[in-house]
């Protein structure tokens, strides 16, 4: 290399080096320098992993020059207005899929973190099943701990395996099949529907009360009886239990609050309001009442108890009050909210699709009768599974409105995802240890490349079409892989039973013509309708 060339380079570089030596300690130079250096090292590390794993650069990357500060603020804005899920679907189905063909994976920044967002069924399969050990729950345990503690919904690794082994027997077929336990609660629900006298009312609010009543009875051995109120001339038999009246509202508030904490990722602790902490204390106080009641019983007493109570069965395995409370609340989140949301969306769609409603009603009446001729004793776990159109309606409600529309995992090691890189998006992409990977099932379920141009339309008939029966990982309403929902059959059975009983008793279902559609969606830990399911039923 000529000496003159080196001399010329030094002449050019030396002033810059001297400038940085003099000014590097100044914050307005130091901070940008650190950020640029970290960004350069991050890019270098990514390139190394791509070389190591024979991966390709991301096809899609959403630029955010605010280092990911604007993105969560924008998401919070849409969430506050009940349109964050609608926004997510529009972004995927109207931007990335259209501009980049069949690419369903994108890189973005949230609070300075480089995050991968995907709706690709192959990537979802890898995250949840084939590469299960490469991913963990990340910060989920941290931001949910104050409410749910250490339970199956929040734990990873050995703790999760122990929880699952302890809980799996509680969802055996004989427990799931006990639909008759629902009937007393359904009878109270009927009173509320009749009270409306054909006028518009919010059935979602009733469904959430119904499922908290049935879930607390199944789990705790005593219902909060939130449906039994003065408006129908009833009073709860459990009114003296501490925290009973406030429990449902406190549980709802704490979950909604946690959904905002989720958007802040590792900065979740910024949101820690007094009402949030008060709500958690109310929830724990109610749960502790029943835990102490169970622990006051001897092993012999527990064996003598009539009927099935989830808490009593767990108390045979452990006498630790915190373990019992944590597991109960973890199951309550999944069991209560998913069923209430499913029923709400199903009846919201049935009320605006009269042809579907009449067809479903006909199937139910033919199999189980109606009104005074209703053969309630014939509605069993087995007979519900034979109702093909009912199953199609439930499947379609879960497709258009999955209970958990958006979720995430964190890489436990340097790894890959099978698709999202290269010019066509079909090559593997590198994932760094500690990197967040989000998957939006709602957008997958509404992908026109998978479900056709009517992917956003509630159409149960699609479940009788051959191509829909081969969806694989393009339909995952209850997650999949080792962490597949233990209580999915419980939720499906309860939702089906309640649907059958309502359509046996009430033969007209409508909604106001000016009802907003698509509806505004609220995503706390599970999906629900922002404005309720306002219908007329008589």
From Swiss-Prot:
Spans traversing the lipid bilayer: 27-46
Effect ascribed to mutating residue 514 to N: In strain: EH15
Keywords: Heme, Iron, Membrane, Metal-binding, Monooxygenase, Oxidoreductase, Transmembrane, Transmembrane helix
Enzymatic class: oxidoreductase
Location (main, coarse): membrane
InterPro entries recorded: Cyt_P450, Cyt_P450_CS, Cyt_P450_E_CYP52_ascomycetes, Cyt_P450_E_CYP52_fungi, Cyt_P450_E_grp-II, Cyt_P450_sf
Stated induction or repression of this protein's expression: By alkanes.
Any single Pfam family the record assigns to this protein: p450
A GO cellular-component term linked to this record: membrane
Cysteines engaged in disulfide bonds, as pairs: none
Molecular function terms, GO-annotated: heme binding; iron ion binding; oxidoreductase activity, acting on paired donors, with incorporation or reduction of molecular oxygen, reduced flavin or flavoprotein as one donor, and incorporation of one atom of oxygen
EC assignment: 1.14.14.-
Binding site for heme: 485
Location of this chain's protein in the cell: Membrane
Membrane topology, record value: Single-pass membrane protein
CDD domains per UniProt: CYP52 (cd11063)
Cofactor: heme
Protein family membership: Belongs to the cytochrome P450 family.
Described function: Together with an NADPH cytochrome P450 the enzyme system catalyzes the terminal hydroxylation as the first step in the assimilation of alkanes and fatty acids.
Name this polypeptide is given: Cytochrome P450 52A4
Lineage: Eukaryota, Fungi, Dikarya, Ascomycota, Saccharomycotina
Name of the coding gene: CYP52A4
């Amino acid at each position: 290399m000529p000496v003159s060339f080196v001399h010329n380079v030094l002449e050019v570089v030396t002033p810059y080096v001297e400038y940085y030596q003099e000014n590097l300690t100044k914050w307005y130079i130091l901070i940008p320098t650190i950020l640029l250096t970290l960004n350069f090292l991050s890019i270098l590390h990514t390139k190394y992993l791509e070389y190591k794993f024979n991966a390709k650069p991301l096809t899609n990357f959403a630029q955010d020059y605010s280092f990911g500060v604007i993105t969560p603020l924008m998401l919070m804005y849409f969430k506050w207005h009940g349109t964050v899920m609608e926004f997510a679907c529009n972004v995927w189905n109207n931007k990335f899929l259209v501009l980049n063909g069949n690419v369903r994976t994108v890189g973005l920044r949230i609070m300075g973190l480089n995050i991968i967002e995907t709706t690709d069924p192959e990537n979802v399969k890898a995250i949840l099943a084939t590469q299960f050990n490469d991913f963990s729950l990340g910060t989920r345990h941290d931001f949910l701990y104050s409410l749910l503690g250490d339970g199956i919904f929040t734990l990873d690794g050995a703790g999760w395996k122990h929880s699952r082994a302890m809980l799996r027997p509680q969802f055996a077929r004989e427990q799931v099949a006990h639909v008759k336990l629902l009937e007393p609660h359904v009878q109270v629900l009927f009173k509320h529907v009749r009270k409306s006298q054909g006028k518009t009312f919010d059935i979602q609010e009733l469904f959430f009360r119904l499922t908290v009543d049935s879930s607390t009875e199944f789990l705790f051995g005593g219902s909060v009886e939130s449906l039994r109120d003065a408006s129908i001339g009833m009073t709860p038999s459990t009114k003296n239990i501490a925290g009973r009246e406030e429990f449902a509202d406190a549980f709802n508030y704490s979950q909604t609050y946690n959904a905002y904490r989720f958007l802040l990722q590792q900065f979740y602790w910024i949101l820690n309001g007094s009402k949030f902490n008060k709500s958690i204390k109310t929830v724990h106080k109610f749960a502790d009442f029943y835990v102490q009641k169970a622990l006051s019983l001897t092993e012999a007493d527990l064996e003598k108890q009539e009927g099935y109570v989830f808490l009593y069965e767990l108390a045979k395995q452990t006498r630790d009050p915190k373990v019992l409370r944590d597991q109960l609340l973890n199951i309550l989140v999944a069991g209560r909210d998913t069923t209430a949301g499913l029923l709400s969306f199903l009846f919201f769609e049935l009320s605006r699709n009269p042809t579907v409603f009449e067809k479903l009603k006909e199937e139910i009446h033919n199999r189980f009768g109606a009104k005074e001729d209703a053969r309630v004793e014939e509605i069993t776990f087995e007979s519900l599974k034979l109702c093909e159109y009912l199953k199609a309606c439930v499947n379609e409600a879960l497709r258009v409105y999955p209970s958990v529309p958006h979720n995430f995992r964190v890489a436990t090691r340097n790894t890959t995802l099978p698709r999202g890189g290269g010019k066509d998006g079909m090559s593997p992409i590198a994932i760094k240890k500690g990197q967040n990977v989000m998957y939006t099932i709602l957008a997958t379920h509404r992908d026109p490349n998978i479900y056709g141009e009517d992917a956003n339309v509630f159409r149960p008939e699609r479940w009788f079409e051959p191509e829909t029966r081969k969806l694989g990982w393009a339909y995952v309403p209850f997650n999949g892989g080792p962490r597949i929902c233990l209580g999915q059959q419980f939720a499906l059975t309860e939702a089906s039973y309640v649907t059958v009983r309502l359509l046996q008793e009430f033969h007209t279902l409508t909604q106001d013509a000016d009802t907003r559609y698509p509806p505004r969606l609220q995503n706390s830990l599970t999906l629900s309708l922002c404005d309720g399911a306002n219908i007329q039923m008589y």
